[in-house]
């Protein structure tokens, strides 16, 4: 498995530790890191972005394509790299979420890990529930954005369900 998939709810203990879902740990470990990388989101929403080393390297490549002295690159690097944290798994598969990221996302006693392919998100459960309702309403309008690379999966004549 090379991607983060699924939704898992876990408790944060009094020390700020949370158990990373086993399937998410497996993805990151397969990519060569016994931990995860977390950083603030670039989009609106109260959550933390997370990934393994493969997506982190992609972020580096995206930043490398920008003018190294541009204001935009400096700001993006500040958020994506400067505010990021490499969090190593303990013997029980837990990581210690940094205070700044927990506060940013409004995380207190419980989190929802949400897979997003090459990355994942860590949400406060109520915030994710509201986001999920909105996503379910809006996602039918995004269907055309998904284009299959396999001819056998393309609908005939553009018809839908």
Swiss-Prot record:
Gene3D superfamilies: Transcriptional regulator MraZ domain
TM annotation in the entry: none
Record flagged with keyword DNA repair: no
Ranges for domain SpoVT-AbrB: 7-55, 84-127
SUPFAM superfamilies to which the protein is assigned, alphabetical: AbrB/MazE/MraZ-like
The keyword Magnesium belongs to this UniProt entry's keyword annotation: no
Entry-linked InterPro entries: MraZ (IPR003444), MraZ_C (IPR035644), MraZ_dom (IPR020603), MraZ_N (IPR035642), MraZ_sf (IPR038619), SpoVT-AbrB_dom (IPR007159), SpoVT-AbrB_sf (IPR037914)
Any one annotated GO CC term: cytoplasm
One term of GO molecular function: DNA-binding transcription factor activity
Keywords: Cytoplasm, DNA-binding, Repeat, Transcription, Transcription regulation
Subunit structure: Forms oligomers.
Source taxonomy: Bacteria, Pseudomonadati, Pseudomonadota, Alphaproteobacteria, Hyphomicrobiales
Gene Ontology biological process terms from the UniProt entry: negative regulation of DNA-templated transcription initiation
Protein name per the record: Transcriptional regulator MraZ
Gene source species: Parvibaculum lavamentivorans (strain DS-1 / DSM 13023 / NCIMB 13966)
Family according to the record: Belongs to the MraZ family.
Cell compartments where the protein resides: Cytoplasm, Nucleoid
């Amino acid at each position: 498995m090379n991607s983060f998939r699924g939704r898992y709810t876990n408790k944060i203990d009094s020390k700020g530790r949370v158990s990373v879902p086993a399937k998410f740990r497996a993805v990151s470990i397969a990519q060569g890191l016994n931990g995860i990388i977390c950083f603030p989101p670039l989009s609106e929403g109260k959550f933390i972005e997370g990934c393994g080393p493969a997506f982190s390297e992609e972020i580096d490549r995206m930043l490398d394509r920008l003018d190294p002295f541009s204001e935009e690159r400096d700001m993006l690097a500040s958020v994506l790299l400067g505010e990021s944290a490499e969090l190593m798994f303990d013997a029980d598969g837990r990581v210690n979420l940094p205070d700044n990221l927990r506060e940013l996302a409004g995380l207190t006693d419980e989190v929802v890990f949400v897979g997003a392919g090459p990355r994942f998100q860590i949400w406060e459960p109520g915030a994710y529930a509201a986001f999920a309702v909105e996503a379910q309403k809006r996602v039918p309008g995004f269907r055309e954005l998904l284009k299959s690379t396999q001819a056998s999966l393309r609908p005939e004549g553009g018809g839908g369900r």
